[in-house]
From Swiss-Prot:
Organs and tissues of expression: Expressed by the venom duct.
Protein name as annotated: Conotoxin TsMMSK-B022
Major localization listed first in the record, in broad terms: secreted
Signal sequence segment: 1-20
Keyword Secreted listed: yes
Family: Belongs to the conotoxin M superfamily.
Annotated disulfide bonds: 53-65, 54-61, 58-64
Cellular localisation: Secreted
Keywords: Cleavage on pair of basic residues, Disulfide bond, Hydroxylation, Neurotoxin, Secreted, Signal, Toxin
Species of the source: Conus tessulatus (Tessellate cone)
Proregion residues excised on maturation: 21-50
Amino acid sequence: MMSKLGVLLTICLLLFPLTAVQLDGDQPADLPELRAQDFAPERSPWFDPVRRCCSQDCRVCIPCCPY
């Protein structure tokens, strides 16, 4: 009886962390199309070097300046 309980406890302890924690590969990329292009906002024509953000078109240039 005790050995069955030990086996059950071991199985539960081994399986729980594997299903409870997301792996890095499961995390969605926030902007995969920009990462694939090796995007640097400093090279964007809308990048404001003084404010260190983009003044136009937030879909293309990130970080966006607050209005």
